[in-house]
């Protein structure tokens, strides 16, 4: 897409939101309480603030204000307002490719906010526990928040990820013509690194005419030891391992596809 000469400021709003899920099996009620306490501490407001602040550092944004809160009995929220940076549109790379990691060069972010909310929960009987983090990066200007995607998914290792990217509003060129998107995109996947894509099953549901893009991700490899809380596979019988594996797989399938799977 050729560079546009705009009349005034770029008024397009670009929003990236995604949910990450961590799945775990905790056998007893005490273990389930222990998992929720553990994950609640791992992703408390201070830790989330560190992650989002590092995100701002990577993309070259200045933090104006931070609002954070831990909740009782569990969960946390952090919202960061970011200052507007003057950006020359000619210097902005709008091509489809993975965004930066902490060791890479930074990109500038215009008016924006970054927020995260966490939701730990557990099944009342089956031993299944899930942790969900909702993250949103929203910008107003020439930069796409997709540039922050690669870092955030690397930082928040997860079993399942669902992502939505949308562009809203319009901006005018010097001839008064409205433009409803200012960069090429056919999939969120194009903004992820190859090593990340190799780890996940992926599925797209895109509505191109509405500038809405949706991608789901689920880990390909399943290793039971990574899903047990306060237990080891060698401590379980073959029957228990098979039962727990089936429970976890069903839980992941239901979250990935967004519907309950009937018993067979």
UniProtKB/Swiss-Prot annotation:
Its EC number is 4.1.1.50. Binds 1 pyruvoyl group covalently per subunit. The record marks 111-112 as: Cleavage (non-hydrolytic). Signal peptide: none annotated. The modification Pyruvic acid (Ser) is found at residue 112. It catalyses: S-adenosyl-L-methionine + H(+) = S-adenosyl 3-(methylsulfanyl)propylamine + CO2. It holds the Pfam family AdoMet_dc. Keywords: Autocatalytic cleavage, Decarboxylase, Lyase, Polyamine biosynthesis, Pyruvate, S-adenosyl-L-methionine, Schiff base, Spermidine biosynthesis, Zymogen. The active site is at 112 (schiff-base intermediate with substrate), 117 (proton acceptor), 140 (proton donor). Is synthesized initially as an inactive proenzyme. Formation of the active enzyme involves a self-maturation process in which the active site pyruvoyl group is generated from an internal serine residue via an autocatalytic post-translational modification. Two non-identical subunits are generated from the proenzyme in this reaction, and the pyruvate is formed at the N-terminus of the alpha chain, which is derived from the carboxyl end of the proenzyme. It is an enzyme of class 4 (lyase). One of its GO terms (cellular component) is cytosol. Pathway: Amine and polyamine biosynthesis; S-adenosylmethioninamine biosynthesis; S-adenosylmethioninamine from S-adenosyl-L-methionine: step 1/1. NCBIfam families: SAM_DCase_Eco (TIGR03331). Catalyzes the decarboxylation of S-adenosylmethionine to S-adenosylmethioninamine (dcAdoMet), the propylamine donor required for the synthesis of the polyamines spermine and spermidine from the diamine putrescine. Belongs to the prokaryotic AdoMetDC family. Type 2 subfamily. This is S-adenosylmethionine decarboxylase proenzyme. It comes from Yersinia pseudotuberculosis serotype I (strain IP32953).
